[in-house]
Amino acid sequence: MKFYIALALALFGISQSPADDHAVVLVYHHVSEETPALTSVTPTAFDSHLDYLQEHGFTVLPLARIIEDLREGLELPQNTVAITFDDAYRSVYTEAFPRLRKRGWPFTIFVSSEGVDRGYGDYLDWSQLRELADAGVELGNHSHTHAHLVRRLPDESETAWRQRVSADIDTAAQRLRAQTGSDSKLFAYPYGEYSQSLQAIVKEKGYFGIAQQSGALGGQSDFLALPRFPMSRSYSDLRRFATSVNSRPLPVTSVSTTGADEISFRPLKELRLTLADGDYRAQQLACYRASGAPLQLTVIRQKPLTISVAVSGKQPAGRHKINCTAPASEDAGVYFWYSHQWLIKQADGGWYRE
């Protein structure tokens, strides 16, 4: 009940806050010192994140509320953030929930239902998820099996693939509804992997697609591949955290690529972006590989600003990302951000291993 009251008071007070047209979404997995560093933040680091948000006047809202308001062109409070967790790991209940409940902050858990059904060691159980749902926590769909949904099985036709993936998403929705009463229309792609074909299935089912590439949300965002900033031990220091939560969406209006496609999943040769005007320094726009290596950028046209990013260097099998950023015109330390993801198969046409 205290969590409900605190949440209601927080939502009631936002109408008096300065308005904004964007938000940032954070994604965590484990909050623990015992789990893999790649998908974990320590409880101490998590505390520092929450303290930063509170001390710097951020408003934490439910992700579904943020998405609906942005889609409808409504204003959000200044410095709006959503907090999400993927996979429904136990530490969300034991470590994150008490801390967020104390502050009266909402959050979302994207649940892979098979792990809960089978009682996988690090997963929450249904009784804990019901308790969280009863406390106002939003439970989103993260598929049933947490499989690489973009991948077809050997000799699997497109029709068979669509049926299998559709059933996987539906099963998770049915289990969430039956066990917790949740009927969220938020779907987080397992591993953050998506393709146009998978996005089409997600759209047909009436979901918003939630990805894992970095960036802020705005009204021009792709609502079938909404970005989130991943938080892990490698990315959890406060300086990097502050850069993430203060970012803004780079106003990309069109995207085209050369080389990469979702049939062969080949290396990307060129990324071309068209951008709307905004409060960013276009002359300082830069693009980088996920490793931080800078990429060559060529201005194709000034009005509207269109750039070509040449993708050089090795591209081994796996997930790849390009981050494009530009500093804000006036606010020091604030960056407009866009991230592009693509997938590459192995040379023999097989898929990479996690």
Model-derived features: where do they sit?
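Catalytic cores of alpha/beta
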Residues: 199
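Metal-dependent polysaccharide deacetylase catalytic core of the NodB/CE4 family, i.e.
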Residues: 21-36, 56, 76-81, 89-91, ...
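Catalytic-core region of carbohydrate-active enzymes that cleave or remodel glycosidic bonds
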Residues: 171, 176-179, 203-214
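Terminal accessory/targeting
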Residues: 1-79, 101-107, 112-124, 130, ...
